[in-house]
């Protein structure tokens, strides 16, 4: 079982005050009409990559490259775009960068096909609510949030997601990690009208989807993570989508589209090609994802940030591989990625 990535604790009194406000919101008539149910809403189904965050040579957020990443995803025929989450180095981003980046993504995405999902987790519940309201204001199609803390109990998780889900009418994705099991997710489903989507990275998602669908009368829609390694098995079992990384999302999207067109052999062949990139990414870590975007002309640089944004303690680990961890992209790794990209060029859309 995976360990939950710690965020920060919040002031409980302030949290309960905010929860009271959100509870009032849930009583407003019409609250249960979700954005996804309104005419013209983009479908929340398919390949929704968690985007990498580009930085300039001076380590500033590169908005132009971030906008180009949205366009790159659209050109690849990909179904959605998610930012910022763990793979986006979100704990290194300042509040101003989060707000500015979300607005740029939503504005660009409004004219394109992919649905835009904005990550709203933060060092406390008040800022998470602020991010959620901002996402709704700038026109995002949905929001997603990690849980509040490594050591939070199910009641605290439930209260947190009630507050975040009650802050807007946007559909809410809950990112299930650590020990967030089926019972807690079903309790959330019953208590939070906007919660209808799970990115499941807790325990064994392949084993959880059956009970989640059955106990929610198939109203909870399940997405996967973990680089989409089990995508074929997930589609067989009725997953509604996957949230892999962005650099080769066009390959995942082709796998998804082929499978749902009934071309299962072709889908499995395409997924086999995608696995070439997946193994390289796992071997060489998050910098390799940015390097592929650099090779594909989306990013101008591919370095990672190593400093946390204000509000996060030094005890909080950044993304896997980005905090002086086990993986490193060396020259041999770069050569391997270049050769893999060259081999797969005939299959790339973007």
Indicate residue ranges for each PLM-predicted region.
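C-terminal segment of classical bacterial N-terminal signal peptides
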Residues: 27-32
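Boundary at the C-terminal end of the N-terminal hydrophobic targeting segment
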Residues: 35-36, 41
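Structured C-terminal cap/extension of enzyme domains
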Residues: 233-350
């Amino acid at each position: 079982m995976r360990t939950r990535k710690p965020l920060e604790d919040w002031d409980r009194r302030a949290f309960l005050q905010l929860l009271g406000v959100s509870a009032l919101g849930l009583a407003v008539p019409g609250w249960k009409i979700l954005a996804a149910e309104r005419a013209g809403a983009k479908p929340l189904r398919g390949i929704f990559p968690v985007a990498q965050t580009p930085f300039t040579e001076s380590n500033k957020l590169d908005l132009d490259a971030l906008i180009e990443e949205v366009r790159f995803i659209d050109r690849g025929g990909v179904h959605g775009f998610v930012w910022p989450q763990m793979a986006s180095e979100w704990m290194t981003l300042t509040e101003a960068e989060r707000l500015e980046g979300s607005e740029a993504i939503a504005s660009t995405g409004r004219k394109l096909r992919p649905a835009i999902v904005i990550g709203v987790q933060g060092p406390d519940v008040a800022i998470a609510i602020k991010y959620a309201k901002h996402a709704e204001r700038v026109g995002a199609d949905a929001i997603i949030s990690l849980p509040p803390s490594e050591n939070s109990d199910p009641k605290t998780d439930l209260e947190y997601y009630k507050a975040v889900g009650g802050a807007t009418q946007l559909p809410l994705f809950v990112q299930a990690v650590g020990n967030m099991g089926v019972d807690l997710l079903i309790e959330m489903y019953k208590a939070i009208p906007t919660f209808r989507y799970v990115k499941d990275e807790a325990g064994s998602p392949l084993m959880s989807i059956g009970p989640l669908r059955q106990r929610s009368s198939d109203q909870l829609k399940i997405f996967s993570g973990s680089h989409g390694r089990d995508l074929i098995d997930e589609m067989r079992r009725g997953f509604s989508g996957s949230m892999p990384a962005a650099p080769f999302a066009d390959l995942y999207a082709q796998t998804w589209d082929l499978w749902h067109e009934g071309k299962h052999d072709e889908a499995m062949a395409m997924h086999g090609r995608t696995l070439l990139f997946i193994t390289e990414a796992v071997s060489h870590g998050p910098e390799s994802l940015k390097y592929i975007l650099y090779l594909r002309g989306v990013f101008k640089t591919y370095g990672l940030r190593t400093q946390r944004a204000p509000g996060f303690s030094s005890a909080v680990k950044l993304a896997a591989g980005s905090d002086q961890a086990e993986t490193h992209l060396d020259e041999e790794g770069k050569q391997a990625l270049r050769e893999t990209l060259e081999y797969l060029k005939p299959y790339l859309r973007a």
